Design a protein with these regions (language model features):
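Well-ordered, non-transmembrane segments within structured domains
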Residues: 1-2, 17, 23, 154
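…primarily DNA-binding HTH/wHTH and HhH modules…
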Residues: 2, 90-153
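Terminal helix-turn-helix DNA-binding modules in bacterial transcription factors
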Residues: 8-16, 21, 25, 44-83, ...
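Short coil turns linking two alpha-helices in DNA-binding domains
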Residues: 30, 34-35, 83-84
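Short hydrophobic/aromatic patch on the recognition helix
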Residues: 38, 42, 87-88, 92
Length: 154
């Protein structure tokens, strides 16, 4: 199996299980490769670690829940695959530069949010969006190359 095919399979597994607890030991046992090898090829192919990818996907997915529901932040955290509110809030703040509650305020009409917080949100959100677009392009390119390989052997 080529490393890029393996990375696509890992991406698909992660995306399908994003709301569950995912560990490197689990990924390693599913794909029958050493976890260090899997982490290395993932980073080499995508220029992001597996755990960073998982956290950014989870946080990005939680943005819609914060924006469009009145659910408690702990409920959103648990529904996004985090085991605790503290870890979710810490990860959210690390990635976006503001807390989940500050982001929620930002999305509400007539919100009271400082210019500094607003600027932080505006500069960091495109980074996550571009990462996810880059991952989709990567997956599509691998799929296209697989189709070409198959047609060459017909």
């Amino acid at each position: 199996m080529y490393s890029n095919e393996l990375v696509v399979k890992m991406l698909n597994y992660i995306d399908d299980n994003l709301y569950k607890r995912i560990t490197m030991d689990e990924i390693s046992s599913i794909f029958y490769f050493n976890k260090d090898y899997l982490m290395r090829i993932f980073k080499k192919e995508l220029d992001i670690t597996i755990m960073d990818y998982i956290n950014k996907r989870r946080i990005f997915n939680s943005l819609e829940l914060l924006k469009n529901t009145d659910d408690l932040v702990i409920k959103i955290a648990l529904n996004s695959g985090y085991s605790s509110l503290e870890y979710y809030s810490e990860t959210f703040t690390k990635i976006l530069g503001v807390s989940p509650l500050t982001y929620r305020k930002f999305t509400k009409v007539n919100s009271q949010i400082s210019d500094k917080e607003l600027e932080i949100i505006r500069t960091r959100l495109p980074d996550i969006s571009s990462l996810l677009k880059r991952i989709d392009i990567y997956k599509n390119n691998i799929k296209r190359s697989e189709v070409k390989k198959i047609s060459l052997f017909k």
